[in-house]
From Swiss-Prot:
[4Fe-4S] cluster 2 binds at C192, C247, C428, C432. This is Cytosolic Fe-S cluster assembly factor NAR1 homolog. Keywords: 4Fe-4S, Iron, Iron-sulfur, Metal-binding. It comes from Schizosaccharomyces japonicus (strain yFS275 / FY16936) (Fission yeast). It holds the Pfam family Fe_hyd_lg_C. The keyword Iron applies. The lineage of its organism: Eukaryota, Fungi, Dikarya, Ascomycota, Taphrinomycotina.
């Protein structure tokens, strides 16, 4: 059993008081009202005939969490109970000969395991690959590096088209990837499911600002199921995709109905490094029990397309949350203003460790061309909301939307400071590298208490240890066109939609439970 506590998780959430997603009640006739209790079971007894029927157990699904406004994002305890490593073991034990199992691992989760076991990320990749292919019967183990490059590329194209539409200015930008529906500025990142749930449940007026690009997890899940289903000639139902991710809300993301194709989810199950360690303990598996030198990355990944890079150790420049801001800033500087060298062109303003602003200045006039920010942790997200208005939730959303529109389209203020064009938003303080599912320091590390900033920096050092890389835009475009030859397919599969969750304003418990 995985045990969680407030000090283990960032922004830890118990199920809300209003977490009472109603179970459908079947109306009974007057002669069917008696309830009989026997041990741990409950039975309904018909008065006239004496017929006994065992009552089912009421339960809450992940879809219920997505449709309920009782919690701000989700309750980690619910996520653990409904999608855990026990599910992995159940499917592994039930695997049939024609089933095809895939593990996709995020670089942040890999770095967490590397720091925890004092290994390099390369050694962790080899170890996890060996465990899952040899011990757990998985067919393929990949990371989400390549799918992240697809997401970054799509997000940059979306931003540039939105910026041009909002500014109605002539630039050197010429998109060869079709036209996407422009977003009002600032464009807000969408790879963090905790942030997305927060917007959908409490500030739905901001949905038009949210990037529609799928996260790397969902891009990879769809791509891998499509490819192996076609390549192996098997149904998507026979392909089971497991994700190893740094946060629990990724379980919710995988459960969204938007990510279902042919009644099959693109990602079937999500676990975190904490849960993986518990799984390995049940099988008495540790890195020390394996000869890592005898393993090779190239020994697996059968049938993968030649254009799909299964493992990327080098990371993109920028944040350890995927580098969205850095990539989009670099891409937009070239695409919009024909600026190739950003050296001495970026002014950085740090409000706190989790709120940093970046300004791109003109090499000729010194004026601000683009202004972007990273915003991590609900404290900063709440501050953003509080600075705009503190009325009712719908009112706050409308005021915030109006203010943000004015911010993005109005000329510079008297101080010459331009308003934000793009924000990389993550729910966890420190971003994805400090996700709630990441491992704490080993018990032998007495210098740390909980997940501290120092420990987070150590995990981040492992994340960037192999070095940095630039996205090969031409290779990514070629891969996308090979996989999705038409623009309509690209829009359908690489983008998604968001949905406002109706607040139960007539429920006094729900009203009292607002954040």
């Amino acid at each position: 059993m995985v045990k969680l506590s407030a000090e283990d998780l960032n922004d830890y959430l118990n199920p809300g008081v209003a977490c009472v997603k109603p179970v459908k009640v079947q109306k009974k006739q007057d002669n069917q009202q008696n309830i009989k209790v026997n041990g741990e079971s409950y039975y309904e007894v018909t008065k006239d005939t004496g017929e006994v029927e065992e009552l089912g157990i009421a339960s809450i699904s992940l879809n219920d969490c997505l449709a309920c406004s009782g919690c701000i994002t989700s309750a980690e305890s619910v996520l653990i109970n409904l999608q855990s490593y026990h599910e992995v073991l159940k499917f592994v034990n039930a695997k049939e000969a024609d089933d095809f199992f895939i593990l996709q691992m995020s670089p942040q989760a890999r770095a967490s395991l590397a720091a925890y076991y004092n290994l390099s990320v390369q050694e962790v990749q080899l170890w996890i690959q060996s465990v899952f292919t040899n011990e757990l019967k998985f067919n393929v183990v990949v990371d989400t590096g390549f799918s992240r490059e697809i997401s970054l590329r799509q997000a940059a194209i979306e931003f540039c088209q939105s910026w041009v539409a909002a500014n109605a200015a002539k630039t050197v930008y010429n998109s060869k990837s079709g036209e996407v529906a422009p977003k009002p500025l600032p464009v807000l990142s969408s790879s963090c499911p905790g942030w997305i749930c927060y917007v959908e449940k409490t500030h739905s007026s901001l949905i038009p600002h949210i990037s529609t690009v799928r996260s790397p997890q969902q891009v990879a899940g769809r791509l891998l199921k499509d490819w192996f289903s076609y390549q192996l000639g098997i149904s998507r139902k026979k392909i089971w995709v497991l994700s190893l991710m740094p946060c629990f809300d990724k379980k919710l993301e995988a459960s969204r109905n938007d990510f279902v194709n042919e009644q099959v989810r693109d990602v079937d199950c999500v676990i975190t490094p904490k849960e993986l360690v518990e799984l390995l303990k049940t099988k008495n598996i540790s890195p020390q029990s394996m000869d890592l030198d005898s393993l090779s990355i190239s020994e697996q990944t059968p049938c993968l397309p030649s254009w799909y890079e299964p493992v990327q150790f080098e990371q993109q420049n920028g944040s350890s949350s995927g580098g969205y801001l850095h990539y989009i800033m670099t891409f937009a500087a070239k695409a919009l203003f024909d600026i190739n060298d950003l050296t001495n062109r970026i002014n950085v303003s740090q409000k706190n460790a989790d709120m940093i602003e970046y300004e791109l200045t003109s090499p000729d006039t010194g004026e601000t061309l683009l202004r972007m920010a990273t915003c991590y942790g609900f404290r900063n997200i709440q501050n953003l909301v509080r600075n705009v208005g503190r009325k009712s939730a719908p009112r706050r959303g409308r005021v915030l939307l109006k203010r943000m529109k004015n911010m993005s389209t109005s000329p510079s203020t008297g101080t010459g400071k331009q308003k934000l064009d793009y924000v990389e938003v993550m729910a966890c303080p420190g971003g994805c590298i400090n996700g709630g599912g990441q491992l704490p320091p080993p018990e032998s590390s007495a210098d740390f208490s909980g997940i501290s900033r120092e420990w987070m920096r150590q995990v981040e050092a492992h994340y960037f240890q192999p070095g940095v890389r630039q996205v090969d835009n031409a290779a990514v475009d070629a891969a996308v066109e090979h996989w999705l030859p038409s623009y309509s397919l690209q829009q359908s599969i690489l983008h998604t939609k968001y949905h406002a969750v109706q607040n139960d304003t007539e429920n006094p418990v729900a009203l009292a439970n607002t954040w």
